[in-house]
């Protein structure tokens, strides 16, 4: 079984895959809050508790972290507790098969890279990936699977929390779809601005990408939503085509299998 670990600023998601290649299947996933202070031992304790009987069935691990302190602890955890298991940490220098056609490839987040890889693998077409996480990332992937760049905006929670904390008369509200775009009270007005406002932000960015890049003006372009808040925002958009909740986990699986295949190819002449 392959364990995939997706560490973001807000949540950590674990995914467990059986099989490989076309026969791979995500059989279970877990979600927990990210704590940048967690140690390798604490991470191992939590992971083992969630995995239960599957702990001893892990044959590989593929992980990414957008939180540097947690990435360091995951590296220690893998060495200490799963040292006998092949693992891949997606970071600069790791081969993903995604050409990064940007000014500074080392600045591109691992989450954006694996999302691009998974999108190209699933659809084999020009793709625009919208990841609704701590930040809202719009990533542009060519028909060849190249990462062309994109846009980063504040996430839904960050924007809502900032509005409440910086405004004396406003308070934090539950982020749900209001009954109308025209709010009848302060709570509904804030919910309308958040939900419909972010839907408009996404639609605006997607339309600008399609207008600016000739290769993205056709009907073959696929716009994919992923991330924690995708189920809330996607239904209000006009440009998003598909929802792939496990896109990052799928990308981590693909990176692991590509690196394992490469290692096998390097070993084969000596066998």
UniProtKB/Swiss-Prot annotation:
Enzyme class: transferase
Binding note for cofactor: A monovalent cation. Ammonium or potassium.
GO cellular-component term (any): cytoplasm
Record carries keyword ATP-binding: yes
Domain of life: Bacteria
SUPFAM superfamilies assigned: Actin-like ATPase domain
Family, similarity comment: Belongs to the type III pantothenate kinase family.
General function of this protein: Catalyzes the phosphorylation of pantothenate (Pan), the first step in CoA biosynthesis.
Protein name stated in the entry: Type III pantothenate kinase
Source organism of the structure: Rhodococcus jostii (strain RHA1)
Gene symbol of the encoding locus: coaX
